[in-house]
């Protein structure tokens, strides 16, 4: 899925060395200090770790409960082709620019680890070299996580998956041979950049890698099951994982013992009983050979339906049993690197029950968990605050226990304005995404911090059916638009403020309210639709 929808340095050199603000180690002489000539030293051994790292099993305990900084550093299509412009890509899927404050908030709420999905292919030159601007931004976000006192996982994300044009990592023998050199060069660059970071930084080999047919659930599902095709896909997954481990270890330093994460085919977890091949991704996953013992972690993802809670607990419990049977038995722990639900409209009560149960059950079994987004997303990250506070509380209490008291700020704690930066011609800000029954509502009113130039902004109201629209030019800083049922039908499905230019433009929305038939006002929360970025500005 889009999912529509990765430092601190500790090193001893002579007595000890100081780390620069970017987290890299400076040794004597590197900053231009005079160094006295010395006799040629004896040949040095292979570079070793600066510090001893905890084992993979210990890391699961140390990480605590985790969250995904999703739709942030992994977008692969944004309407932009400049892979150096990190801000455009980071905000391209509706998220605010990541800040240290966001990471501090997650730590204070009780989270101990952040998975930072990163896509790389759109940020590399023709020779596979990552643009320095992009690598610097990834480095900066990693530092935010570690500076907050949490663990961090970075990976190769939407370079895998179902997009046939952009997913250049494919689980097949031919796919591996085509991508091997580029894949290994990419991991060499990442590993060298972070070589001296401490044990709180983990690397993840790849995200949800699929076969040539882009099969989910198990290999060779989409084109009619072929045992030879499936075997080739599973072998490729293991080959990619081995390449990853070998390349990272070869860079030396702390990478010699860094805990590394390898994913099953498609990050599939084997759940369900509707096909006899569902367990194949687990049965065919192999622990990569490694120079050091106990520093490999397996990863799967999980998105069960949760409408029937007892059935969910049975299915997910069996799924967790299978991780122990097929993966943990090989000598490595498991993390569920993404989890959530595929239920279309789960009740908050069901979701919170599931979240609390799952976080606690996985902790009991020694399995790590990273919830996929849906806690602080979009403009909420710019304060920062939680947009799903009940869910966040359920997760951390499921892990830490009911006696734990998390700090969970919410939007109601603040008086806010909404600063909108338009970047694209025709881009749109949601004034409201709600479906509006015109028998109950008569219009919408909003206030801006300025009167825009004539023709620059247009109120666009999406009607009941495709092609039914109502438009009105914005001509003042305070506007009221009455609904016209003859143009819209019985309801409005979305109301936006559309930008009619391609020049960068910023304006602040101070308030938005729907007008009910009885003249009472119902406040709305603006949000980015596409082509714009929204920042929340605290006014009091």
Predicted regions and their residues:
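Extracellular glycoside hydrolase catalytic/binding regions
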Residues: 95, 185-188, 192-200, 209-367, ...
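Sec-dependent bacterial lipoprotein signal peptides
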Residues: 1-19
């Amino acid at each position: 899925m889009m999912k529509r929808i990765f430092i601190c340095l500790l090193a001893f050199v002579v007595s000890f060395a100081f780390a620069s603000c970017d987290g890299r180690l400076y040794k004597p002489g590197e900053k231009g200090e005079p160094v006295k000539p010395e006799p040629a030293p004896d040949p040095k051994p292979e570079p070793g770790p600066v510090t001893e790292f905890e084992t993979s099993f210990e890391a699961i305990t140390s990480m605590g409960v985790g969250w995904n900084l999703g739709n942030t550093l992994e977008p692969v299509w944004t309407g932009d082709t400049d892979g150096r412009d990190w801000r455009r890509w980071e905000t391209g899927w509706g998220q605010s620019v990541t800040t240290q404050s966001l990471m501090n908030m997650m730590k204070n709420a009780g989270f101990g680890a952040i998975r930072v999905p990163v896509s790389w292919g759109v940020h590399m030159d023709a020779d596979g070299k990552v643009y320095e601007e992009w690598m610097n931004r990834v480095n900066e976000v990693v530092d935010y996580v570690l500076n907050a006192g949490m663990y961090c996982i970075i990976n190769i994300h939407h370079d895998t998956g179902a997009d046939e044009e952009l997913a250049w990592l494919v689980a097949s023998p031919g796919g591996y041979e085509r991508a091997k050199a580029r894949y290994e060069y990419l991991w060499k660059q990442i590993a060298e950049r972070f070589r001296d970071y401490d044990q709180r930084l983990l690397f993840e080999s790849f995200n949800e890698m699929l076969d040539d047919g882009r099969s989910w659930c198990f290999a060779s599902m989409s084109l009619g099951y072929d045992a030879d095709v499936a075997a080739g896909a599973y072998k490729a997954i293991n080959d990619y994982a081995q390449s990853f481990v070998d390349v990272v270890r070869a860079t030396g330093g702390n990478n010699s013992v860094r805990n590394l994460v390898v994913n099953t085919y498609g990050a599939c977890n084997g759940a369900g009983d509707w096909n006899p091949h569902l367990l194949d991704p687990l049965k065919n996953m192999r622990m990569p050979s490694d120079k050091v013992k106990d520093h490999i972690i397996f990863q799967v993802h999980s998105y069960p339906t949760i409408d029937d809670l007892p059935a969910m607990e049975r299915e997910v419990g069996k799924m967790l049993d299978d991780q122990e049977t097929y993966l943990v038995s090989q000598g490595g722990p498991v993390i569920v690197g993404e989890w959530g639900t595929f239920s279309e409209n789960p009740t908050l009560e069901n979701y919170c029950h599931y979240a609390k149960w799952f976080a606690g059950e996985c902790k009991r079994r020694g399995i790590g968990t990273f919830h996929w987004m849906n806690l602080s997303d979009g403009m909420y990250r710019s304060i920062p605050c939680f947009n799903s506070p009940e869910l966040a509380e359920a997760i951390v209490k499921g892990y830490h226990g009911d006696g734990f008291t998390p700090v969970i700020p919410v939007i109601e704690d603040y008086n806010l304005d909404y600063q909108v930066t338009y970047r694209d011609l025709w881009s749109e800000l949601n004034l409201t995404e709600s479906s509006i029954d015109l028998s109950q509502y008569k219009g919408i009113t909003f206030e801006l911090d300025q009167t825009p130039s004539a023709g620059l902004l247009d109120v666009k109201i999406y009607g009941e059916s495709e092609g039914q629209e109502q438009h009105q030019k914005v001509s003042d800083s305070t506007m009221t638009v009455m609904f016209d049922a003859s143009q819209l039908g019985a309801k409005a499905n979305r109301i936006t403020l559309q930008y009619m230019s391609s020049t960068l433009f910023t304006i602040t929305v101070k308030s938005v309210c729907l007008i009910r038939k009885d003249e009472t006002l119902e406040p709305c929360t603006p949000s980015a639709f596409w082509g714009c970025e929204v920042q929340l500005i605290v006014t009091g």
